[in-house]
Regions:
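Active-site lining segments that contact anionic ligands and/or coordinate catalytic metals
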Residues: 5, 235, 280, 341-343, ...
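A conserved beta-strand->alpha-helix junction
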Residues: 226-253, 340-342
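Structural beta-sheet core signal
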Residues: 181, 205-207, 240, 285, ...
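Active-site adenylate/phosphate-handling loop in enzymes that bind or generate adenylated species
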Residues: 126-131, 164, 169-176, 247-248, ...
Length: 414
């Protein structure tokens, strides 16, 4: 009897030459971690695919989870049989029946080794004849068929599937180093974080809270965002920086039109220090060119010069509708639209500068002790840990997060 399995296809991982095995092992580990809630029997490599075997009644849900893991191009629910033609032909009938509506089909057989007595063309003909008998009202079509039945012969086994679901693609998390992301409870920064994770980066989010000048609602929403990204993208640690009092100090000391730039220079500087602690090589933000006053070219340059490490802005050329569509796709949009006062709305000027002059920015920067403020914020920084197989904690900054109430208390508070 044919067993249900998942065949995971990958594209970019397969292009990595001598490092291919390394990337495949990372992807396999990430798939195992994403399926921690499932009864997985094994995750292994077979002939350019990753094979996942599990409890059969979990097949559909497991496939949906695997699709969300960066590095996965496609997921196919397949039937696993032995080399008996009767077995794999029967599996082909089942696979095509599950495909959905179709008028035409084609069989595509592939052998990973040549010790099987039948050539690929013979398997195609053999399976095709059985399918023609099972579906007499459907036609065989060699070019652009509605359904393609794949028959993969690997060692002593045959895998048969007709339906594939697209994955998120990219590279497996943990294959491209570590970055610090500025994560708010808004729409943009969760998408930017996800996009860097999709390129293989381990993302370490830093959330600047308006506390104690605002409630800590945004801190809980950010935790919800991190949980929404899981299990496909697992974030191991969230840093929380209580920024409200420092914003108040800046609002008193600096010209009102330059407040936002000063806020962001401090945020970047703190993020850079955390990046050094974490061994991260870049900062990631959710900025999109021209979307708000702080995101003009002049203002981006004025903020960027406060740090030495690279700042990645994966959304810089995206419009709001594109960002919203992606947020809906990754499951963070509804959380991000919940009302939550945070540092982004605190002590905002009526007329923020849109084309900052560097001389004026430097003068404002010297109107308060920014170095002392950065050090103070670092000492006040707290963190929350989450389950993750890719995150490796640094040996410093061991302070826990005592201010946040347990999740159950927060739900009662709602």
């Amino acid at each position: 009897m044919a067993a249900r399995v998942c065949l995971v296809h990958y594209h970019e991982v397969g292009l990595k030459g001598k490092n291919r095995a390394h990337f495949e092992h990372i992807l396999m580990d990430n798939i195992k971690a994403a399926l921690a809630a499932f009864s997985v029997n094994a995750v292994s490599r077979i002939s350019g695919y990753i094979l996942v075997t599990f409890n059969e009644h979990q097949a559909d849900e497991a496939a949906r989870v695997i699709r969300t893991v960066p590095g996965v191009a496609r997921v196919s629910l397949a039937y696993h049989t032995n080399r008996d033609p009767q077995e794999y032909c029967a599996a082909a009938v089942k696979a095509l029946r599950e495909f959905g509506p179709f008028d035409s089909f084609k069989v595509h057989a592939k052998r990973s080794n040549t010790d099987y007595e039948l050539a690929s063309i013979d398997i195609n003909r053999q399976v095709g004849e059985v399918l023609c008998e099972a579906f007499p009202d459907k036609k065989v079509q060699m070019h652009d068929p509605d359904a393609m039945v794949h028959v993969l012969v690997v060692q002593g086994s045959v895998y048969v599937y007709a339906r594939s679901e697209r994955g998120v693609g990219g590279l497996p998390v943990g294959s491209a180093g570590k970055v610090v992301t500025l994560l708010s409870s808004g729409i943009d920064s969760p998408v930017a974080t996800w996009m860097l994770a999709r390129r293989g980066a381990v993302c370490v989010p830093v959330h600047f809270s308006g506390r104690p000048q605002t409630p800590d609602t945004s801190e809980y929403l950010v935790q919800d965002i991190i949980r929404a990204l899981a299990p496909g993208v697992q974030i191991g640690r969230l840093y929380v920086v209580p920024f409200g009092d420092c914003q108040r100090e800046i609002s008193v000391a600096c010209p009102s039109n330059l407040r936002v730039i000063m806020y962001r220079r401090i945020m970047y500087s703190v993020a850079e220090r955390i990046a050094h602690i974490e061994g991260a090589k870049a900062i990631v933000t959710g900025e999109s060119l021209g979307q708000v006053a702080s995101q003009t070219l002049e203002n981006i340059m004025a903020v960027n010069e406060a740090v030495k490490i690279p700042v990645f802005r994966p959304l810089i050329g995206s419009d709001k509708q594109e960002i919203i569509a992606r947020a809906e796709e990754i499951g963070t949009f509804d959380i991000s639209t919940e009302a939550a006062p945070d540092c982004c709305t605190l002590f905002m000027p009526r007329r923020p500068e849109t084309h900052a002059k560097l001389d004026a920015v430097h003068e404002a920067w010297e109107l308060f002790d920014h170095e002392e403020m950065i050090e103070r914020l670092l000492k006040q920084t707290e963190y929350i840990d989450f389950e993750s197989n890719t995150y490796k904690a640094p040996k410093t900054l061991k302070r826990k997060h005592p201010q946040l109430a347990p999740r159950e208390i927060y739900q009662d508070h709602e």
